[in-house]
Amino acid sequence: MSALLFDVDGTLTDTGGAGKAALGPAMIEVYGETGPIETFDFHGRTDPEIVRGLLTAVGWLDSEVDDGLPALWPIYLERLAEALDQVGDRAAPLAGVLDLLDRLTADTRFACGLVTGNLEEGARLKLRAAGCADRFEFGGFGSD
């Protein structure tokens, strides 16, 4: 059996900016600011790296950021679920993804997994919104 690994954002799904829309208010609630969230490049980073990058850019120490992460994640995940509800059908699988996943999951030669910087629950929320959460047997996440 071969493992086939997929990223979430921009590979499997387009969530209409729900992640950024959720992170900003959650960061304000926990840290009182977001840093340069509108210009910061989220791609290729784990969720913890994104928060550290945003706040260290405005003078926070890594240790100060890390101290707030346990409080941030539940708020972020709640806001993410709300943001995904608001974007509705715009939280969708990219073209051809569902057909590809249907073929791969039906073929016993393959096991589909996730490799993503998203928190595990954040990835699952995004995939549920896109209608493909049940296609993945395992994964590595930004929360690991």
Identify the role of each PLM range.
Residues 5, 82-114, 120:
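Short, acidic loop-to-helix structural element flanking the phosphoryl-transfer center
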Residues 22, 122-125:
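Phosphate- and divalent-cation-binding pockets in alpha/beta enzyme and binding domains
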Residues 1-43, 49-52, 56-59:
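Active-site neighborhood of HAD-like aspartate-dependent phosphohydrolases
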Residues 26, 76-78:
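Membrane-embedded alpha-helical bundles of multi-pass transporters/translocases
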Residues 125-144:
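Histidine/lysine/aspartate-rich catalytic loop segments that bind and position anionic ligands
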Residues 29-34, 59-62, 107, 131-135:
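Short helix-capping segments at alpha-helix termini
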Residues 117-118, 144:
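Active-site cradle of extracellular carbohydrate-active enzymes
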